[in-house]
Amino acid sequence: MSLLRCTTLLLVVVAIALPPCILGYSLHDGSRLDDFLTESAADRRPRRPTTAAQRRLMGLTEEQYKTVHFYLNKLKELGNQRHPEGYDKDTTKDEADKWRKRMRDDIEGELLNPEEYGRHFEGDIILFPEQAKQIYENALKTGQRRVKRKFIGSDLRRWDPTRPIVYSFDGSHTSREQRIIELALEHWHNITCLNFVRNDNANSGNRIVFTDVDGCASNVGRHPLGEEQLVSLAPECIRLGVIAHEVAHALGFWHEQSRPDRDQFVNVRWENIDKDSKGQFLKEDPDDVDNAGVPYDYGSIMHYRSKAFSRYDDLYTISTFVTDYQKTIGQRDQLSFNDIRLMNKIYCSNVCSRKLPCQRGGYTDPRRCDRCRCPDGFTGQFCEQVMPGYGAVCGGRIQVNGGWTKFSSPGYPREFKEGQECSWLLVAPHGQVVEMQFIGEFEMYCKVRHSLCMDYVEVRNSTDFANTGMRYCCYGTPSTSIRSATTDLVVLFRSFYRGGRGFEARARALPANGQWASWSPWTPCTASCGACGSRMRTRVCSHGACAGEPVENQVCNTHPCNGLCAHKKTEDGECGGFLALLRGVRCKQERTVMEPCENACCPGFSVVGGRCVR
């Protein structure tokens, strides 16, 4: 089994369970993972308490903390004013305590997405005062939050990919918890060009310090003034998927569902959102987005779940426009392929001098420039092969025709085993499409209360297999009849947590002789210049199967940006507070100035013939 595939599986691990494939996995210090996670006497010792005041405030001073929460409270008020749906000012319940208990797992008693329960921006994001002020002021003016998403845009907050990222621990984690955190860092190392080095003696310069003083929480991106930044991982956060989520914040990721194009993919149910949380769902300014051309991703580890910040247990706050994607959003098992692709586009695009002819949505691997990094389900130097089964003989390439071809989970109708994986590529003849239906009994482990798949069958039927597909789980046979957009359709069976009955399905080829209705008008472009925006249109197929997509997305407003842009500048200035009394001491200050735009095009685009092109 390849190291890449094995490390992908790592992120399904919760506090103590690890799949068998990684028991021989080695870290930089040469430790074997079976020794790596063994509890020692040190793990059973009480944690050393963290007493520094700034640790309690996650690196902020008392005054900074008050300023940030002043603007967060104003943002909360603004959200309730703009979206009064479902708000009852006469409600007298203690909703704060009830909300914190609400989404605990029925069976295992654990918080499914613990980062949502924090007291910070969007639950787990530590803002600096200037960020909080900017977010509120732009929301006040435009109804949107002016922040660069999905990836932070300021160069001051991006790490230097040519230098190792220093990290340390403040002593509040047990040695076992430290090992799990380092395993998550090792995963980021393996799938990007980024390197991490532990230095517990570092006392200056940019570095990440892991603590456990404030739930699950992190700043976004590198500290612009070259100081330490805290990533809080309390005991309930010590799961590899949650750790990867918080580390992604520290590396520059914001949350997925706040992208300005989100209304093309999900519907925010304002009437179902907790009255103190509506400010968390305002969108960003579309002219200030940096998604590096990576599309909206239902399967992103940075996406809220379906019932995030809901008033009551059974209310959806986010509904996907395509219903079959509903159980895809909110997963904290593993980084999606597009999460990894975006990180590599931002930090690693110049590592490999030659770009390989990768297939199936793959791209040149910055860790191995002679191979492609492939979407789940594919392998080979150029992603030309279907990934073989793991734990069972299953999967492969199936050529379908006009008759039904059946395939199923391992051993069906007997139960499959935990840890088994199968990948199928269903191929129809030229000019035809694949139709797939589930048949027979269906059982895959899910969190019913949270509307989230844990084990699943995923179907990718779009033109780009890099995008996360529709995930099916729980109990009862899905009634959906799925058709591919091209001659190919991908089906992934993944059992990370439990065994079960599994699934049986059938597939056949259909002539692509349906008739498309006219395209709808284009939606407004999400950005005004620089090929930074996208627009969408839809169409409906009738009288059979239609080749092609019912939805089309397009880069728009490709003319270069000009005029003035906001830039962050760091310069020496007068010190405040106690330091102002010291003669000759100068302090670094960051301020925003309007200057001619440096980047006429979004990352990944350049000016050719007066237009921004890839």
Swiss-Prot record:
Gene coding for it: dpy-31
Disulfide linkage: C193-C348, C216-C237, C352-C372, C374-C383, C394-C422, C525-C556, C529-C561, C541-C546
One Gene Ontology cellular component annotation held by this UniProt entry: extracellular region
Propeptide: 25-150
Domain EGF-like intervals: 344-384
Glycosylated residue positions: N190, N461
Compartments in which it is found: Secreted
The organism's taxonomic lineage, starting at the top: Eukaryota, Metazoa, Ecdysozoa, Nematoda, Chromadorea
Organism: Teladorsagia circumcincta (Brown stomach worm)
Cofactor: Zn(2+)
Domain CUB, first and last residues per copy: 394-510
Active site (UniProt): E246
Protein name stated in the entry: Zinc metalloproteinase dpy-31
Domain TSP type-1 residues, every copy: 513-562
Keywords: Cleavage on pair of basic residues, Disulfide bond, EGF-like domain, Glycoprotein, Hydrolase, Metal-binding, Metalloprotease, Protease, Secreted, Signal, Zinc, Zymogen
